[in-house]
């Protein structure tokens, strides 16, 4: 059957208009979503400065512990907003290099949750401790109060190294005079049902527990 070539330009324009219309609709939806998510400009900022545990690897932003803290702050009448500054794979050295970005959001509180990747890679606990101190100091110099979240290593890393690793957080917190949550993954780390199949990253329920256990350390730092 012979095609009517006179229809080709018309069909071409219809395709173009359909694509343009779809893009316009998608753009409008993105704008609407952004407008709904626009933060309160008068709210104080809490930056959560960490690695993939903070970024929420394997869960949604709302399910990750920073998102759960944000929801609880709003529910209990605190005018704060959470900025999730978690970067997967980050170490304390990497964190130190990006503190300036975190300070650009002018946080009144910083939750520092780095060090897990230092330990998993067997890096120097002395250098990690120094990095943590410098990170905390930078936040303090920028006017933020700091909550330092510690980490612990599995027994297979050796008692001596695991002990030095854990003490590094306590010593850094003591020297900088900040609040220490001894173990971010308390009640979650090592529990198969609360972690993804990799055995490292928490499930949504694991993140709920982290947020609940972190809350009592955070509340005394808040104001309404």
Predicted features along the sequence, with ranges:
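Alpha-helical cap/lid subdomain in secreted, periplasmic
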Residues: 2-5, 9, 75-78, 94-224
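Acidic-and-aromatic substrate-binding clefts and catalytic sites of carbohydrate-active enzymes
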Residues: 89-93
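Bacterial N-terminal signal peptides
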Residues: 13-26
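Serine-esterase "nucleophile elbow" of acetyl-processing enzymes
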Residues: 32-88, 98-106
């Amino acid at each position: 059957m012979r095609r009517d070539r006179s229809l080709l330009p018309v069909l071409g324009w219809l395709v173009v208009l359909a694509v343009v219309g779809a893009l316009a609709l998608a753009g409008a939806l993105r704008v609407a979503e952004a407008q709904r998510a626009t933060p309160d400009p008068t709210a104080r900022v809490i930056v959560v400065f960490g690695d993939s545990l903070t970024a929420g690897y394997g869960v949604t932003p709302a399910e990750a512990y920073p998102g759960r803290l944000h929801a609880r702050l709003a529910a209990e009448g605190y005018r704060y907003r959470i900025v999730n500054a978690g970067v997967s794979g980050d170490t304390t050295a990497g964190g130190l290099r990006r503190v300036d970005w975190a300070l650009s959001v002018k946080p009144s509180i910083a939750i520092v949750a780095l060090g897990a990747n230092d330990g998993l890679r067997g890096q120097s606990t002395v250098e990690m401790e120094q990095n943590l101190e410098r990170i905390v100091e930078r936040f303090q110099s920028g006017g933020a109060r700091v909550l330092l979240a510690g980490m612990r290593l599995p027994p297979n890393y050796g008692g001596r190294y695991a002990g030095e690793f854990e003490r590094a957080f306590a010593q850094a917190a003591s020297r900088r005079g900040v609040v220490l949550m001894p173990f971010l993954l308390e009640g979650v780390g090592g529990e198969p049902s609360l972690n993804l199949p990799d055995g490292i990253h928490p499930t949504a329920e694991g993140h709920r527990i982290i947020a609940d256990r972190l809350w009592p350390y955070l509340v005394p730092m808040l104001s309404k």
